Amino acid sequence: MNYKQACIKRNIELCILFPFVLLGKILGHFIKPRQQASIFLFFPSADIGGSPKVNATILHLLKDRKPLVIFSKKPSNNGFKELFDSANCTIIDLHKLIDNKYYHFINVIYRGIISSWINKSPKAVVMGGECIYFYKIIPHLKSSVKKIELSHLNTWLDYNQAFIKYIDYRITSTPNLVRNFQIQYKNNQVPEKYLSRLSYIDNWVDIPPYKEKKASTLNVLFVGRGAAQKRVHIISAIAEQLMRANPAITFTFVGDVASFLSPYVLSNATYLEFVNDKDKLYDLYDQADILLLTSAFEGLPIVIMDMMARGKVVVSTAVDGIPDYIEHLKTGLLIKEIKNEQIIQENGVELIEMLFNDRALLYKIGLEARITALQKFDRNIFEEKYKALFS
């Protein structure tokens, strides 16, 4: 679907749903939010993941201004609930009302209710962190409301192009995604005036003191969700091949990925479904030598940043934003094949065996990765840029 078609589809939907939205706006005068706010943050849920972690980081950055957080999607695990709750801000979880296809009209009515809250708020600022409901709300907001979109993946491009004209700032977490937007704008004949609204802000991570790890074994770590894009079954195949051949190579899996692991890997690797304790998770990072990812698509996972900050070597498929930060044989190792799973498996095995046999290279790449993290993942720059957006 091109830009013009997306806009036509959007306008038809807005016309059809107008009576329900209008009803919601009327109800919004009687249904009051639990807290008056000038900042409204739309997030899908508090599930574990890189994107929700960034959302929580932004919430904590703004907590003194008491933003209102709206969750719209049924959570899978709510693993970051405590992280969001610890900001001591008002959170309205609407998923039981608006994430149900059997009474979708309530979803539409709430667009009117919430937009009326926002439109009545002086100097309102609205941000959507990969949240579909954000796009449903913004056509109903006054032009004076500042609207900010945060994206980490290019999987949203076809959907959100219909809402380009409503968004004042389109923020991505990698330069690659900005390039994706620019290509889309050109191919779909999006007016050039909207290009100036694109920019990226690198996420930040803590840079802990460097700990040199000396051991005869080599520990390979995977951290992530059990999502299809992660292709954990490939990592399982790599792990089984390496562990059967060399007992000194060990694997640790963190995430809800048991169903993707072979019986051999489940029996012989370390497996932890969830690690909510941040210190325990960081201990696992420190104990590892390598982070292995074989994703089909990614933005820049926070775990990559965390591992680079610790001087660990990232071995990953060269997808999307990752090559902007991982330079092969300098700051990490890239698997250039991204489609043929057998070749990905073979390359992954070869690269890990190479690092096992060449500890000097492992050490050298790890130090270069840490230097890159120090340069790019700066907390002060992150905070200054986001505070400026919400000013």
Positions of the model-derived regions?
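Short alpha-helical donor nucleotide-sugar binding micro-motif in glycosyltransferases
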Residues: 283-288
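A conserved mid-protein helix/loop that constitutes part of the nucleotide-sugar donor-binding site
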Residues: 50-57, 227-241
